[in-house]
A protein has these predicted regions:
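Glycine-rich FAD pyrophosphate-binding loop
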Residues: 2-26
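General beta-strand structural signal in soluble alpha/beta enzymes
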Residues: 10-12, 75-76, 107-109, 139, ...
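Short hydrophobic core segments
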Residues: 11, 108, 112, 125, ...
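An anion/pyrophosphate-binding glycine-rich loop and adjacent beta-alpha core
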Residues: 15-17, 22-23, 31, 38, ...
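N-terminal glycine-rich dinucleotide-binding loop that anchors FAD/FMN and/or NAD(P) in oxidoreductases
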Residues: 19-54
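Feature captures the FAD/FMN-dependent oxidoreductase FAD-binding
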Residues: 53-136
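Rossmann-like dinucleotide-binding cores of NAD(P)H-dependent redox enzymes
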Residues: 73-97, 162, 166-187
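Glycine-rich loop(s) and the adjacent beta-strand/alpha-helix scaffold that form part
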Residues: 136-182
Length: 295
């Protein structure tokens, strides 16, 4: 807006700018994905078409060009993920702040409380400290996922005040809690190149992807699990079953052949040693107990 010649005022309730941006991507800041709009939409679990017009007007290529234009060199990593070359989120927020200052954007340390309307149009924003007259207002408050960074749901509340229907937000890109004790027994174990699938209560597969995951003391986490969480609806009301294929490159028949071959060739060794050639070491005793096998 400022680059287009507008006089811009930014209302920021935090004591510093970019508080949430600085912790994204584990502090590295995954700024976008280097792919087409169609590819981006294909990875949005629900109602991706709603974002089409916005993404077409400002594509990931536009975002990359903008950031590099204000002095943030970028790199593309596995999965088309784009990061600053420095691997430092503060470089991104710092460059944005400098650009704001150069364009004369005014920063007010204040929280927006409500939108003021006159004759059917928004005329001002009411802050906690004062009123801000405005010819146009952009709501860019974030969601409600991390209140400590300022994402407290203010945008939902102000939009609802103006008559918009708000769909109840649900967690996405989050770890999952499991009631299976095996998870705690294998906490810290990371799995790579596995196939994770999720089935709903009717047995329908709602998610299935290859990648990496991690067992924790409360359940499972890691890239695959975070992606899966976006596909699991209303988990406070429903349960889901997760299946992990440790050898996705092998068919069930091929895997059985390999297991039988290992058992024949290592008939003088105990089961734990035999399975160690097929499973991660820390998983073997857990699986033996689960299956009632003597290690």
């Amino acid at each position: 807006a400022a680059e287009g010649g507008g006089q811009v005022t930014l209302l920021e309730p935090n004591d510093r700018l970019g508080k949430k941006l600085n912790i994204t991507g584990k502090g590295r800041c995954n700024v976008t994905n280097n792919c087409t709009v169609e590819e981006l939409l294909a990875h949005i679990p629900r109602n991706g078409k709603f974002l089409y017009s916005a993404l077409v007007r400002f594509t990931s290529a536009d975002a990359m060009a903008f950031l590099e234009g204000i002095g943030v060199p970028l790199k593309t990593e596995r999965g088309n993920r784009v990061f600053p070359v420095s691997d430092c989120a503060f470089d991104v927020s710092g460059a944005l702040k400098k650009r704001m200052e150069k364009l004369g954007v005014r920063w007010e340390h204040d929280r927006a409380v409500s939108l003021l309307v006159e004759e059917g149009a928004i005329s001002a924003v009411q802050g906690e400290k004062k009123e801000y007259p405005a010819a146009a207002v952009i709501l860019a408050t974030g969601g409600v996922s991390y209140p400590g960074t300022g994402s407290t749901g203010d945008g939902y509340r102000m939009a609802a005040q103006q008559g918009h229907t708000i769909v109840e937000p649900h967690g996405s890109l989050v770890p999952l809690v499991s009631d299976d004790s095996c998870c705690e027994q294998m906490q810290g174990l990371a799995l790579k190149n596995v196939l994770l699938s999720a089935q709903n209560e009717k047995g329908k597969t709602v998610f299935s992807e290859f990648g990496e995951m991690l067992f924790t003391h409360f359940g499972v986490s890691g890239p695959l699990v975070l992606s899966a969480s976006a596909h699991l609806r209303d988990w406070d009301k429903h349960t889901y079953r997760l299946s992990i294929d440790l050898k996705p490159a092998l068919s069930e028949e091929k895997l059985e052949e390999r297991l039988l071959r290992e058992l024949r060739e290592q008939s003088n060794r105990n089961m734990e040693n035999v399975l160690s050639s097929l499973l991660p070491h820390s998983m073997v005793p857990v699986m033996c107990r689960r299956l009632g096998l003597s290690p």
